[in-house]
């Protein structure tokens, strides 16, 4: 909080957050990794695994999440922020780059803030715990100035990338993304958006690229140089029934060609989405300033890759297993503490019955004759009743609690703890 220009570099977060449900607390969100009231923070080359709740939240402007690995995030999907996302970024000018994310629970994966840059990410296997949503979710106010480029979005029951909301969003840019095996590749509501050189295929019952006729109408939206099996102005309707609104040029649309885009790609099963030499995609596009300036040949190619151009890859640049390992190993202690050998001889056993109505029995073992204290506490840590406070001989013994406090009044139903203290021994 209030820490501008903070840096997290090379950290391994393994089970970093956990709800308190096992303590009977159900209305308190877990403590997660969060930047609040802080600008220009950077999280780089770090791993986040097994979080109960969202993985990371960064608010205010100018944050960067780069080259990070996220796995098995938000496995309960409770007590999330309002939009229900794995990564929540607020403010403006954020960068989300070269990250790998998979096995995610929340309905939406990334909410990037305003005027964000999202590039070179490999994100898949998302949205297991909630309905609706998209891997990259941009609401109305986040669409002007956002740029989503060079990403692999795949293998999920959600949309790939979506300009969402009530149709008032505008001026968002998506280009050079590859989206496959999702439930709707690109979904665009609003107007004056730009969709260039995206490749999309095998995206379930919904279309690969959806430029909505409804909800904003997409007047002024430019759809050029895209390669997909199904491009339409409707979620699932055909191109002939729902022509793409706005400026629609030089796209390879399976609805028009009647063939599968995969037959024109090098080896899509092994992540090689470059066009085959002499395929119908090569030199079939049009030049778009600032987007296709580095094309090879007579004209830009259609789709996310240029034949003879850069063979870009998405996701982290390092190997998880060699960097952090696949399992958690506690760090070595900076110093050692000599343990009291007697401590291991004291034992505090589980009460019985549990739960109970009238009373319950607490059994315990005293290793050496001496002063013993056993007390009952509530969830707030308040001492409710002292059951034992005095000298006891060694051996196994027990005490009964009748669910009353020190004043003899019956306590409310709920969750309580009991604690035993004997010399250096402490157990709850």
Question: Residue spans of the language-model regions?
Answer:
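Solenoid scaffold repeats with emphasis on beta-solenoid/beta-helix
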Residues: 5-6, 11, 32, 40-42, ...
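Short glycine/acidic-rich loop motifs that flank beta-strands on beta-rich extracellular proteins
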Residues: 1, 7, 17-32, 52-59, ...
């Amino acid at each position: 909080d209030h820490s501008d220009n903070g840096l997290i570099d090379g950290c391994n977060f393994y089970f970093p957050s956990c709800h308190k449900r096992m303590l009977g607390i159900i209305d308190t969100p877990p403590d997660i990794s969060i930047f609040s009231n802080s600008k220009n923070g950077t999280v780089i080359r770090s791993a986040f695994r097994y979080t109960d709740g969202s993985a990371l939240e960064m608010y205010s402007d100018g944050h960067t999440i780069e080259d990070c690995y996220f796995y098995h995030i938000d496995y309960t999907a409770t007590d999330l922020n309002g939009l229900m996302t794995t990564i929540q970024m607020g403010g403006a000018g954020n960068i989300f780059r070269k990250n790998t994310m998979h096995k995610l629970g929340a309905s939406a994966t990334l909410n990037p803030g305003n005027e964000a840059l999202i590039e070179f990410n490999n994100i898949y296997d998302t949205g297991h715990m909630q309905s609706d949503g998209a891997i990259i979710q941009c609401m109305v106010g986040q669409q002007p100035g956002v740029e989503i480029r060079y990403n692999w979005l795949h293998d999920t029951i959600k949309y790939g990338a979506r300009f969402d909301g009530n149709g008032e969003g505008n001026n968002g840019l998506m280009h050079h993304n590859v989206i496959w095996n999702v439930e709707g590749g690109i979904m665009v509501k609003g107007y004056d958006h730009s969709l260039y050189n995206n490749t999309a295929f095998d995206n379930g019952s919904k279309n690969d690229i959806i430029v909505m006729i409804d909800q904003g109408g997409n007047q002024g939206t430019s759809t050029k140089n895209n390669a997909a099996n199904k491009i339409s102005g409707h979620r699932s309707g055909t191109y002939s029934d729902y022509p793409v609104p706005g400026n629609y040029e030089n796209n390879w649309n399976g609805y028009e060609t009647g063939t599968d885009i995969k037959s024109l790609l090098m080896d899509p099963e092994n992540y090689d989405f470059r066009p085959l030499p002499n395929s119908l995609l090569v030199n079939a596009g049009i030049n778009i300033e600032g987007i296709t300036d580095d094309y090879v040949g007579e004209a830009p190619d259609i789709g996310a890759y240029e034949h003879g151009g850069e063979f870009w890859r998405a996701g982290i640049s390092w190997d998880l297993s060699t960097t952090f390992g696949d399992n958690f190993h506690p760090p070595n202690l900076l110093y050692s503490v000599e343990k009291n050998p007697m401590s291991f001889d004291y034992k505090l056993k589980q009460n019985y019955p549990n739960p109970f109505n009238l009373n319950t029995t607490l059994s315990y073992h005293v290793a050496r004759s001496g002063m013993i204290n056993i007390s009952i506490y509530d969830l707030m840590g308040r001492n409710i009743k002292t059951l034992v406070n005095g000298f006891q001989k060694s051996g196994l013994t027990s005490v009964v609690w009748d669910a009353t406090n020190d004043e003899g009044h019956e306590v409310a139903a709920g969750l309580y703890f009991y604690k035993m203290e004997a010399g250096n021994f402490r157990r709850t």
